[in-house]
Amino acid sequence: MLTFQFLFRASPATLLLTLYLQLGVITAQEDTRRTIILSTELPQEVTANELTTLKLKVETELRECMVIKAYLVSSKPLAGPFNYKYTGCLCSDYPRTFYWDFQTNSTVRIATVVDIIRELNICPDDQAVVPIKSNRYYAITDLTVN
């Protein structure tokens, strides 16, 4: 019976190792970073055919850089002198801000879309990652025309 008690008794080293492993797992679980963070600025109401600016700020909490393509998708056609698609390198220390100027004469729903893509000659030394989990992010806003 004494031998069984000796086998199942936890030594201080075993308890300490278990504590360190548990703390390591807890720290790893809390260390989740958001891939893409979108912030859009658009007035909620405008008058018909008024020039409107949509501002999109894109950030990441990942340590690696990514090549992104940002564009708009709308429920109705938009008119205006703007570039529909932007491509750039997004890094944690360098958030990107994109602007679109457009006009509309009716209420419209606009989706700002950011795709993470594989493209060369965008990020420095072509050092960029493409996440496995998801590569398309979007934010939907409504613009009411009076």
Swiss-Prot record:
The record's section on Gene3D superfamilies has: Immunoglobulins
Instruction: Report the record's disulfide bonds.
Output: C65-C91, C89-C123
Enumerate the SUPFAM superfamilies for this protein. Answer: E set domains (SSF81296)
Drop me one GO molecular function for this one. IgG binding
Q: Give any Gene Ontology cellular component.
A: nucleus
Q: Assembly and partners?
A: Monomer. Interacts with AZGP1.
Indicate what this protein is called per its UniProt record.
Prolactin-inducible protein homolog
Q: Which organism is it from?
A: Cavia porcellus
What lineage does the source organism belong to? Answer: Eukaryota, Metazoa, Chordata, Craniata, Vertebrata
Quote the gene name from the UniProt entry.
PIP
